[in-house]
């Protein structure tokens, strides 16, 4: 039996202590030997990112997961800084920038609104696929395989039972993310 893919879970939430949904989602990940949970706000509260260290972590893993809340149709500021600095030209893109080619990218996102708010005729005016397009484009720029995002809509309003169900499914996927049904 082959080993499961090594997963780097980049977690970015500036108020993690207040996010019940994200804490529940993280729990199964912390119990899996093939998953490295890397809390960006815990490591870089001053936003001074150790770029060589982050790039080394990326090289060591096959699947990169970005878990974060949706903030103003994007990600928290530190994750945006991380993306801009770590996925640099010559490392992840451009001439010689093939360090992430063939790896897998997946966003795992919590939102404050229901799924129905993400439509052309609704509150947010665009479907989630449009909102997340910059992440998909970044994955393509890095020559990574884009995996459909996991989205927990209206995260604060999910019951404990619903969150536990999401966490189980997420944990099952993390345990073997590249299995035939996992992509």
Curated annotation (Swiss-Prot):
Record GO biological process: positive regulation of potassium ion transmembrane transport; potassium ion transport
Catalytic activity of the protein: a quinone + NADH + H(+) = a quinol + NAD(+); a quinone + NADPH + H(+) = a quinol + NADP(+)
Membrane-related topology note: Peripheral membrane protein
Superkingdom of the organism of origin: Bacteria
Keyword Metal-binding set for record: no
EC number(s) from the headed UniProt entry: 1.6.5.2
Signal peptide: none
SUPFAM superfamilies listed in its UniProt record: Flavoproteins
Main location: membrane
Subcellular location: Cell inner membrane
Keywords: Cell inner membrane, Cell membrane, Membrane, NAD, Oxidoreductase
GO CC terms of this entry: plasma membrane
GO molecular function: electron transfer activity; FMN binding; NADH:ubiquinone reductase (non-electrogenic) activity; NADPH dehydrogenase (quinone) activity
Family, per entry: Belongs to the NAD(P)H dehydrogenase (quinone) family. KefG subfamily.
Function text: Regulatory subunit of a potassium efflux system that confers protection against electrophiles. Required for full activity of KefB.
Subunit text: Interacts with KefB.
Protein's UniProt name: Glutathione-regulated potassium-efflux system ancillary protein KefG
Organism: Shigella flexneri
